[in-house]
Amino acid sequence: MTCDDFRAEDEQPIEVDERRRRLKRKANDDDDDDETVRERVDDAESSMEVFEAEYPPILDPLQDQREAKYFRERMQRFDLYSRTTGLSVDDIDWPLIRGRSLQKGRVAGISFVYDDTRYPINRFSDTWLLCVTKQKLFSFGAGCVEDLNITSFVLRRTMKVLSTYCNWLFEAAKRNNRRHITHKEIQELINRDGFRFHQYLQKFLIGRGMEYTEYNNRFFKYLHEEYNKNPGGLETIYSNQDFIAKETAQANYIYDTVRAKYGGFEELPLFRHALKISFTQPGEHYFSRFYAKRFHEALGCPPLDSEIIMILDWFGVLIMNQIAYKTIRWHEEEYNDGSFPVLDSYHKALADESKCPKACLISISLFPDDPLFDLDIDYGTNPPPVNTAYQKVRRTPRDPTPFYRLMEFEDYKSCLVKMHFNFSELTGEWLRKICARGR
């Protein structure tokens, strides 16, 4: 076939479908049909605006099934642990609750020693949470608590405060347009109390060495200027003279109480073990990923495989410390008979803040709701005993699509410079110019 043949084929008239011709002729002849069609289109658009979902559903049915199954497994364990912790689905406001990873970066200066997640799940029991609470109360001078209602009361109050902290952190992350909690939100919460912020820096953000107790390097000076906005008050914020006095006063009181009531028992290895362990630290010198995952599930936040659980665990120890310290002071102010506090002492000491203002001025936060920070916490009524009937509550999974979109946007921003520039050539003055332009 030659070029002339192709040109001849192109010049041939194209046959138009007869049906299209009839429709076009009918549309030109009938003006009412155009108005009817326009009305139908407007009605369809308005109906789409009314019934359009807030976020499009997940298109992959297999992925949706896997996530729903993962969610049901984790929430089943949450239901199991909630009989001990007292938490319900109404206490949780996690934006991602379908088993997605919420944290990638490091937020603590310490990490897990080894991965022991190979242990079977039936090795963990919800009584471990009660056991840790009992040993922490013992190490804080509240005595060897044999009353299960006391241990349950302290544990449930601690978990309620922790869930409130987690909700606050995620709200702060959403305000900062982040899809997960970063060190910025954690420091924003802890910075509400200067003494706790000092403890946080000392425990999780170690400088050049443990001997540098004044934190005089440039990094902590930057933290101070960023979160306190007062460069002139650096010595006041981080000086040991302001914070060690409070910490020493409470530590000395607890030590004197333990020494007076235990009679030298504090020197035994059993007491040191009770002083070191926590919800994620079953031993004295290591953290356990296995127990950290179970603690995540007890809080209702699967799976959160990150170091943030260490900070939440540290919060839990501080909360129990404050509860025990305040109850002991209140019990001695009321009775002064050398006995250990009972359940009624815990209820009254934590319900009425005005009973012991002088005892609370040393180290206890003066806020009636929050033992550590100035947050509004609705405890409601006292939790029922452990042996009461339990009503299982299920929760439908939320749609995490907007958080996936935010994740893609953040990943794109993080690699934007790498996509347009070669870092091997960006040295010296060129890199400073790019940073100055805000790229």
From Swiss-Prot:
It comes from the Eukaryota. Keywords: Developmental protein, Differentiation, Sexual differentiation, Spermatogenesis, Ubl conjugation pathway. Residues 21-45 are annotated as: Disordered. GO terms for biological process: cell differentiation; male somatic sex determination; sex differentiation; spermatogenesis. Component of a complex containing fem-1, fem-2 and fem-3. Interacts with fem-1 and fem-2 (via N-terminus). Part of a E3 ubiquitin-protein ligase complex, at least composed of cul-2, elc-1, tra-1, fem-1, fem-2 and fem-3; mediates the ubiquitination and subsequent proteasomal degradation of tra-1. Interacts with tra-1. Interacts with sel-10. Interacts with tra-2. Required for male development. In XO (male) animals, fem-3 directs male differentiation in all tissues. In XX (hermaphrodite) animals, it specifies the first 80 or so germ cells to be sperm. Negatively regulates male development when bound to tra-2. Together with fem-2 associates with the CBC(fem-1) E3 ubiquitin-protein ligase complex which mediates the ubiquitination and subsequent proteasomal degradation of tra-1. This is Sex-determination protein fem-3. The gene is fem-3.
